[in-house]
């Protein structure tokens, strides 16, 4: 833009122009963002020596089970995964560094051939899980007919569960992530739960026990939203 000859675009738009503008934004702007993000990450690596990619993986090559998340929780997940792998558990960690546009192809390559993935969500809206599920659905479609260019086709999809944590600053302990892994490999594999929460107490009061039993009967899904936790 020439500051000596400023102009205004998009100030007044009728319906056809507005809709066309939205489509143009997706095709001519958003689709190019990943290239610039990768370029910026490469420049950052050159300057600092710290390497970043839109999707980073640890121990995923031979893993059957995946813990996937964003942000610092993946550092905790790596520490727990290291301990589990020392016990012979084939678990890996996928860390998403770019949320939008979501790097679907990279995520699919990381999840290809896995039995299950647990998405670590620090949000009750489960936005990250929805993006992972969308990528998996598109990869499944591409196995039959390529409708989504660039996304590898998968004939079998891993089961997906959501582990919500940290709401309101709720503490996250290693034992909570171990519980998430144990749930993932279990036959039940609860699809959604809250790490570290306990919705019913071990009360010695007959009145409290009776009330809790009524609540469990009225809201049975609440029982499954809390996992049994061991020691750290």
Predicted segments — roles?
Residues 1-57:
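Conformationally flexible catalytic loops at phosphate/diphosphate-handling active centers
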Residues 57-61, 109-111, 152-154:
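Solvent-exposed alpha-helices and their adjacent loops that cap or buttress functional pockets
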Residues 121-231:
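Peripheral docking tails and interdomain loops at the edges
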Residues 79-89, 106-108, 112, 120, ...:
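Catalytic phosphate/nucleotide-handling subdomain of diverse soluble enzymes
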Residues 96-104:
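Short acidic loop-to-helix transition motifs that present clustered carboxylates
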């Amino acid at each position: 833009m020439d500051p000596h000859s400023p102009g205004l675009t998009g100030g007044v738009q009728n319906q056809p122009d507005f809709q066309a503008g939205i489509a143009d934004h997706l095709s001519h702007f958003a689709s190019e963002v990943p290239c610039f993000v990768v370029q910026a990450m490469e420049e950052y690596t050159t300057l600092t020596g710290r390497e970043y990619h839109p999707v980073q993986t640890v121990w995923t090559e031979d893993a059957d089970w995946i813990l996937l998340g964003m942000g610092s929780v993946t550092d905790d997940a790596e520490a727990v995964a290291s301990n589990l792998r020392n016990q012979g558990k084939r678990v890996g960690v996928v860390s998403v560094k770019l949320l939008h546009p979501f790097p679907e192809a990279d995520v699919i390559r990381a999840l290809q051939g896995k039995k299950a993935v647990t998405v670590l969500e620090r949000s009750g809206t489960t936005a990250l899980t929805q993006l992972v599920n969308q990528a998996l659905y598109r990869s499944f479609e591409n196995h039959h007919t390529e409708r989504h260019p660039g996304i590898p086709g998968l004939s079998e999809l891993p089961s997906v569960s959501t582990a919500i944590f940290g709401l309101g600053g709720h503490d996250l302990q290693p034992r909570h992530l171990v519980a998430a892994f144990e749930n993932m490999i279990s036959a039940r594999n609860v699809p959604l739960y809250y790490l570290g929460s306990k919705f019913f107490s071990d009360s010695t009061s007959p009145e409290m026990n009776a009330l809790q039993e009524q609540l469990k009967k009225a809201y049975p899904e609440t029982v499954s939203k809390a996992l049994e936790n061991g020691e750290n």
